Amino acid sequence: MVGSYVLWLALASCILTLASPEQQGNRNLINTRSYDPCQNYTLLDEPSRSTENTEGSQVCDKDKHGWYRFVGDGGVRMPETCVPMYRCQTDAPLWLNGTHPTLAEGIVNRTACAHWSGNCCLWKTVVQVKACPGEFHVYRLEGTPKCSLRYCTDASTATDKCKNLCRPEEACSFLNGTWDCFCRSDLNSSDVHSLQPRLNCGAKEIQVSLDKCQLGGLGFGDEVIAYLRDWNCSNMMQREERNWISVTSPTQARACGNILERNGTHAIYKNTLSLANEFIIRDTILNINFQCAYPLDMKVSLQTALHPIVSSLNISVDGEGEFTVRMALFQDQSYISPYEGAAAVLAVESMLYVGAILEKGDTSRFNLLLRNCYATPTKDKTDPVKYFIIRNSCPNQYDSTIHVEENGVSSESRFSVQMFMFAGNYDLVFLHCEIHLCDSLNEQCQPCCSRSQQRSEIVALNPARVLDLGPITRRSSASVDITDGTPSTAGFLLAWPMLLLPILLAELF
């Protein structure tokens, strides 16, 4: 019995000893199966790994150990074909020599090859790959056999390469650490008509924009020398989005060589943009003629006139910014032909047209209102001798020649009056208008006029809001000093039409 018991213990010990390694292996298998690399990985969001990246650098992945997932603009999978040297921001790029597994295949071993010295697989290393739910792959990396080697990502697998749709002259490429539309390098053209400039005729500036890619196809480099008729307006090329470059010039006569032409309906600015590859010009340069036509209105006519008789006033409104008002004398009811020069000379019985415009400020909210407009025989706006044309926002109803076309309803005000002169030794007339910026949201801007209202209300002028124009004289008058408007010793022997009426009404107003 003792011998049998000893034999049984020995057998049991042997069985236990043999069973222990098997049980340990089962435990390891259970731990391995419980670890899913699809849920335990490190993200590599490095667009510079893209196979399209040609930036020179010597980045090395010798420190990459573990499971990784590639994401971002550089691509989400390793390339399966040989990658040219010096791509992926390294010397010898690593690519996957084999296909990616499917979900059913689980974890597979693949060979990663490094391209160097003309050999697509000069160095090798084993990489484990697994396909994961959600259509992505994870890779178990074990560093690199040498430096500088780096694991690449296939640019064609990038989820969001170029956000904008590239034009035919562009290609979606990875450059400077990002995907974008860049000019194609294979563009080549000798047809200058293929260059289609864009012209923007603005109120304050004229802008000519050119397609940088089309310029490249015509042989122009990155640095283009551009200048207008006036050489002082050179080196004004500005880079814009989507591979466009532009040149701007002020919307002014003679600025940057602008040539101004006017017909009965439009003001036309003409200029020429010249392009060259170098500052020292030996080859034929490219000339681009352009012009902008602006329909004539009060504002444009003042901008295009060389020496208009005009007055300007800047007004600051609390919380609303700064406003600019201009007032000028015009020759007819179209208000597009301002008087120019040192003085306005009118024929007997002719009409004088006065226009004012709110040029700068919130014209969608504020209307221009002429509160008081009056004439004086001197340029002094406080001269006690005044003849009111507009009083308390309403026209002088005792003067039938006064016609207010617009006042308080928009950013413009216009009125006309038949020319007159003051009795006595005065040769000149000066006009003065007190303005008000009327808030159309909170005020009644359009005047409501009556004859009794004009008589009863007293005029309280604000000199800080008064615009001054002049001098004005009649065509047949003797030569006068137009600088200060002082009385002339000669005076007038002949009275103008409407002379006596303003004198009598001056006592009433």
Curated annotation (Swiss-Prot):
Pfam families named among the record's database cross-references: D8C_UMOD (PF23283), Zona_pellucida (PF00100), ZP-N (PF23344)
Domain of life the protein comes from: Eukaryota
Membrane topology type: Lipid-anchor; GPI-anchor
Region listing for ZP-N, in residue ranges: 200-293
Assigned GO CC terms: apical plasma membrane; cell surface; endosome; external side of plasma membrane; extracellular space; membrane raft; zymogen granule membrane
Glycosylation site list: 40, 97, 109, 176, 188, 232, 263, 314
SMART domains, alphabetized: ZP (SM00241)
Entry-linked InterPro entries: ZP-C, ZP-C_dom, ZP-N, ZP_chr, ZP_dom, ZP_dom_CS
Signal peptide: 1-21
Region spans: Internal hydrophobic patch (IHP): 318-329
Any Gene Ontology biological process: antigen transcytosis by M cells in mucosal-associated lymphoid tissue
Main localization of the protein described in the UniProt heading: membrane
Region (External hydrophobic patch (EHP)): 463-471
Annotated S-S bridges: 38-132, 60-147, 82-120, 88-152, 113-121, 162-172, 166-181, 183-213, 201-292, 233-256, 373-433, 394-449, 438-445
Coiled coil: none
Domain EGF-like span(s) in chain numbering: 158-202
Subcellular location: Zymogen granule membrane; Secreted; Cell membrane; Apical cell membrane
Region (ZP-C): 318-456
Propeptide residue span(s): 485-509
Annotated ZP domain residues: 200-456
Comment text on domains: Each ZP domain consists of an N-terminal (ZP-N) and C-terminal (ZP-C) region connected by a flexible linker; the linker allows the ZP domain to wrap around the ZP-C subdomain of the preceding subunit.
Subunit note: Interacts with SYCN. Interacts with bacterial adhesin fimH.
Role noted for this protein: Functions as an intestinal M-cell transcytotic receptor specific of type-I-piliated bacteria that participates in the mucosal immune response toward these bacteria. At the apical membrane of M-cells it binds fimH, a protein of the bacteria type I pilus tip. Internalizes bound bacteria, like E.coli and S.typhimurium, from the lumen of the intestine and delivers them, through M-cells, to the underlying organized lymphoid follicles where they are captured by antigen-presenting dendritic cells to elicit a mucosal immune response.
Name assigned to this protein: Pancreatic secretory granule membrane major glycoprotein GP2
Gene behind this protein: GP2
